[in-house]
Every structure is written in C-alpha cells, then in structure tokens.
Regions:
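Extended, highly charged
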Residues: 55-62
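FAD-binding glycine-rich core of flavoenzymes that anchor FAD
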Residues: 62-80
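Extended, Lys/Arg-enriched charged tracts that mediate electrostatic binding to polyanionic substrates
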Residues: 74-77, 81-110
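Extended accessory regions or peripheral subdomains of proteins
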Residues: 1-13, 18-55, 98-171
Length: 171
C-alpha cells in the first residue's frame, strides 16, 4: 500500500492491470512513471512534450500514432515479462474523428486532449502468478546518453529511493 500511495503522488504516473478475457484478476500489475516523451493529440493537431517543453508537430495524429507504434517494436530480453516496455495512455471517444468524418457537435467541457500517450522510463511490474516484482528502467534507442556509468547510478539511486518510500510507514 505504501508503494502505491507514494507512487501516485506525482503527475504522469499510472497503474495498469493486465486482465485477460474470462479472468477476474490479471497476471501483471504494472506501475509506470517518469516518461521521457508524452504525445498529445487534440483537434487534429499533434504535440510532443519532452523536457517540460510542449512542441507542436507537423504530422497529423493518425499517421504519428502509427509511426509511434511501429518504431516501438523490439524484442524483450528473456526472463522479463512480455510487457516490460510499453506506451500507455488513453483514446477519448472524440478520437474517432481522426478516422471517420462525423460532426463535432459536443461542447468540450473537460478540455483534455483527444489522445494522450506516454513512454515511461520506469516500470514496476508485479507478476501475480509467480509472486515476483520486476523493476524495469527503460533506456530507449533515441536517447542520447553520453555517460552510461552515470545513467546506471541514476537508476540505482531511483531504485533505492523507491525501496525507502515503500518501507516507510505512513499513518
């Protein structure tokens, strides 16, 4: 419980349960955080949020979403859960307008993007079947890492911080 509470305190984090058809409980519970990229799509416009900067992109949402998915295909190392790296987010009902021409007669009360996708660097995966927890620190091909030793120690520090947070009792 402490892990869940401490995990959800910051923005751009999520919990995902991998429920399969006919099952009550999923095999994996995935906690994601620390996205290096966030894509937002709204009113047929595309945006990339990276390093706290929001940049308008030229590509239309449908094409860009297809490209994101295509570029994200890679092999998961053996011994890790098949969901050890992912793109997470949501597609609103309004996103159907990227595929079909239907009128937009609804008022935008929520003022949230039609689609929001994030690529988390950090995943904590609980394998409910094997009763194991995996800490995944993703390093993506398009990241420009100059010092891998420094990156290793950053990941190690983050893991130790997480252990400390999850073992601290909160009343």
């Amino acid at each position: 419980i402490n892990l869940i509470n401490s995990f959800l305190l910051e923005k751009n984090r999520f919990i995902f349960e991998s429920v399969e058809k006919g099952k009550i409980k999923g095999r994996y519970t995935i906690f994601g955080k620390n996205p290096d990229k966030i894509w937002e799509f709204n009113n047929n416009n595309s945006y990339l949020i990276k390093d706290k900067k929001k940049i308008k992109l030229k590509e239309k949402p449908q094409k860009l979403i297809e490209d994101i998915i295509e570029k994200f295909k890679f092999e998961i190392p053996s011994g890790l859960p098949p969901i050890s790296s992912l793109i997470s987010g949501y597609f609103s009902y309004d996103s159907i307008r990227y595929l079909e021409k239907i009128p937009n007669s609804c008022k935008d009360d929520l003022r949230i993007p039609d689609v929001r996708l994030l690529r988390p660097r950090t995943l904590i995966i609980h394998d409910n079947l094997k009763k194991k927890i995996y800490y995944i620190a993703n390093v993506f091909n398009d990241e420009k890492i100059k010092d891998y030793t420094k990156k290793y120690f950053e990941i190690k520090t983050e893991l130790l911080k997480l252990f400390k947070q999850s073992s601290t009792k909160k009343f």
